[in-house]
């Protein structure tokens, strides 16, 4: 059973910020940046999000799953065998999602 998040949009934005920091980092190999940036979204609560944001999250998760579906990774090491192009596509999706859910300044 998962915990209910009081402010799901705030939580999502926090997770997205963390995911982008990981995605943009250069200390880890690309496959590990993908793995850890996706893990930042683990447990994300969609219930309670504004409908537009909810649709954006679902659309981006579908895009990630489409790429992952080529490989069907079961363990962390499986990400290492993914092509650099596919890994970069996932990182781009993560960053695009963060852009979509972050309020304009």
Spans of model-derived segments:
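Leucine-/aliphatic-rich long alpha-helical segments
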Residues: 19, 41, 78-79
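A structural signal for alpha-helical segments
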Residues: 4-7, 11, 52, 78, ...
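Serine/threonine-rich low-complexity intrinsically disordered regions
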Residues: 3, 8, 29, 42-45, ...
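Short terminal alpha-helical segments
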Residues: 2-38, 91-98
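Short, leucine/isoleucine-rich alpha-helical interaction segments at C-terminal helix-coil junctions
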Residues: 19, 64-67, 97-104
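Low-complexity, intrinsically disordered short peptide segments enriched in small/polar/basic residues
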Residues: 1-2, 19, 61-64, 87
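Amphipathic alpha-helical binding modules
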Residues: 72-105
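Amphipathic alpha-helical interaction modules
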Residues: 22-70
């Amino acid at each position: 059973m998962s915990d209910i998040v009081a402010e799901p949009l705030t939580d999502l934005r926090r997770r997205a910020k963390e995911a982008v920091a990981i995605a943009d980092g250069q200390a880890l190999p690309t496959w590990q940046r993908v793995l850890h940036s996706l893990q930042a979204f683990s447990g994300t609560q969609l219930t309670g999000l504004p409908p537009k944001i909810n649709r954006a999250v679902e659309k981006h998760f579908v895009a990630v799953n489409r790429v992952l579906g080529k490989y069907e990774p079961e363990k962390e090491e499986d990400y290492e065998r993914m092509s650099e192009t596919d890994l970069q596509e996932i990182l781009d999706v993560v960053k695009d999602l963060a852009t979509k859910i972050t309020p304009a300044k």
